[in-house]
């Protein structure tokens, strides 16, 4: 199998950008990542674009138009909280399988206000699943409580994860 390497990364500063489209936001991050490794848009052989909120809007294809690259395969990924990670994994897998040599993985989202970025309003996600919670944090909280009951995990141990994550975010000048 072919080796796969991450050769360029970047991200835009977290924030709200009401004057910009999701593809424009993703294009900025994509160009910054390409600049980081000295590649050009012409080097890209495929795009794996993670986006959940506007998933029906062909964000990947529109992102490519923004950066001036068309005519290459695009895979748009929507997988709840794992959307970006899934796009990255699929990009990696395409290289490992020998399908491509240079691919771009982008995760981009523009959340609205409200539950799940406003996507849980009328016709959206109100309640679902056995827990009837409708939000991933509530579902993860239930999973955590079950883990604690079954394994003796303490609230202090869960809190340490939050502290660790916050400490890591303080090292990122682009974090909120």
What is each residue range found by the language model?
Residues 101-108:
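A short, small-residue-rich loop immediately preceding and capping a beta-strand
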Residues 1-75, 96, 108-176:
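Conserved "HGTGT" condensation-loop signature of ketosynthase/thiolase-family condensing enzymes
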Residues 77-80:
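Blade-loop segments of beta-propeller domains
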Residues 84:
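Short conserved active-site loop signatures built around small residues
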């Amino acid at each position: 199998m072919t080796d796969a390497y991450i050769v360029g990364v970047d991200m835009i500063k977290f924030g709200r950008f009401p004057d910009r489209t999701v593809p424009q936001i993703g294009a900025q991050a994509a160009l910054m990542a390409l600049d980081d490794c000295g590649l050009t848009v012409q080097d890209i052989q495929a795009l794996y674009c993670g986006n959940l909120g506007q998933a029906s809007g062909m964000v990947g294809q529109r992102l490519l138009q923004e950066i001036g690259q068309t005519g290459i395969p695009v895979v748009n990924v929507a997988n709840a909280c794992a959307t970006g990670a899934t796009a990255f994994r699929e990009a990696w897998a395409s290289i490992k399988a020998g399908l491509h040599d240079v691919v771009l993985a982008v995760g981009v989202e523009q959340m609205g206000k409200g539950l799940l970025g406003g996507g849980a309003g009328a016709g959206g996600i109100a309640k679902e699943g056995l827990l009837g919670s409708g939000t991933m944090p509530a579902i993860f909280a239930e999973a955590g409580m079950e883990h604690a009951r079954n394994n003796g995990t303490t609230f202090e141990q869960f809190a340490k994860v939050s502290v660790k994550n916050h400490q890591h975010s303080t090292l990122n000048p682009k974090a909120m």
